[in-house]
Amino acid sequence: MPTKKDYYEILGVPRNATQDEIKQAYRRLVRQYHPDLNKDPSAHEKFKEINEAYEVLSDPQKRAQYDQFGHVGDFSGYGDFQGGWQPGGFDFGDLGRNFEDIFENFFGDSIFGDLFGRRREREKAPRKGADLRYDINITLEEAAFGSEKEIYVTRLETCPTCKGKGTEPGTNPVKCDMCNGTGQIRNMRQTPFGQFVQITTCPKCHGTGQIIINPCHECHGTGKVRRKRRVEFKIPAGVDEGYVIRLAGEGEPGENGGPNGDIYIHIHIIPHKIFKRDNEDIWMELPIDYLIALLGGEVEVPTLEGKEKIYIKPGTQTGEVITLKGKGIPYLRNKNQRGDQKIVVKITVPQNLSPKEKELLLEIAKLRGINIEKDKNIFEQIKKAFKGDN
């Protein structure tokens, strides 16, 4: 039968109360009327009303139904099976629902529970904690040679005050009076297939068999608190963009004795000002003076490990590639093997010449049979000569 009780009035909260306000009111009334704490004969009935109101108002779906219709239907959608098959509001569209949900609506965690995996037991089974993801930017040098890093992780941990019990120090949970500490509610159900025992998780203690009367002031009864921790880890030599490092057991704590989750570090490499990476090789452009290109000589080039001198052979052309063996990125799977550094030569021609330099270059041009057109800039012609244009 639909209830005529005003659940909001029972809990002493307004109709627009938040879930936190409803929970606080419930806990206050539980401490006041719990039969183990209040010996008044009327306390037991009042306590049942409080639990009934909280069961509805703490569930958003049930609360919405209560607010709309003034009651919460029992076994909605299948009619009332007391006394035989009553189709009532049966919606044939519901036939497409998952069979597990249909049978649990009929039988709860009854004999059919084993056929569908025993949902209640699955809920109590150890579960791994949630994994966490962090993204970190590193330099090309750190990617090449590896590095040690640290991050600060905010995660749930066991409450240090109550040691995970959820109760205020010096107090203990009390046995749930709704399920008598079993964590289960057993009801007889008359169905089209006969009479069955319906076993469901206790809505009051959520299957724990215990009720926290005095919640811990630090974790508010959850047994867990958020803490910021420093986590150190190593980046191996040779990693590339998108590489993922797994830190086992550093994620959120597990439930029901399950293992902690993991942290996954996603590596991103900051673009380098000089080098471009190509797998294990690195590439760079090296501007050199045109005289070095003509006559040859030593120049200083940057490498991942510092500056190094190399020799430019006479007559080197723009676009030539000089290879420094073993100066690239170490192979991730073989630290003793490295890629190469590829240097692309880019010859630079001066924009301004002194009169003496111009005179000498004109002499060289004559020796090489180059006709310097007087109406064209000598520097443009020199550039053309280096490019091979005539």
From Swiss-Prot:
Cofactor dependency: Zn(2+)
Q: Which UniProt keywords apply?
A: Chaperone, Cytoplasm, DNA replication, Metal-binding, Repeat, Stress response, Zinc, Zinc-finger
Show the Gene3D superfamilies listed in the entry.
Answer: DnaJ domain, Heat shock protein DnaJ, cysteine-rich domain, Urease metallochaperone UreE, N-terminal domain
Q: Where in the cell is it found?
A: Cytoplasm
**What SUPFAM superfamilies does its record include?**
Chaperone J-domain, DnaJ/Hsp40 cysteine-rich domain, HSP40/DnaJ peptide-binding domain
Q: What is known of its domains?
A: The J domain is necessary and sufficient to stimulate DnaK ATPase activity. Zinc center 1 plays an important role in the autonomous, DnaK-independent chaperone activity of DnaJ. Zinc center 2 is essential for interaction with DnaK and for DnaJ activity.
Cite the PANTHER family for this sequence. Answer: CHAPERONE PROTEIN DNAJ, DNAJ HOMOLOG 1, MITOCHONDRIAL-RELATED
Which protein family is it in?
A: Belongs to the DnaJ family.
What is the protein name stated in its UniProt record? Answer: Chaperone protein DnaJ
Organism lineage: Bacteria, Pseudomonadati, Dictyoglomota, Dictyoglomia, Dictyoglomales
Recorded name of the encoding gene: dnaJ
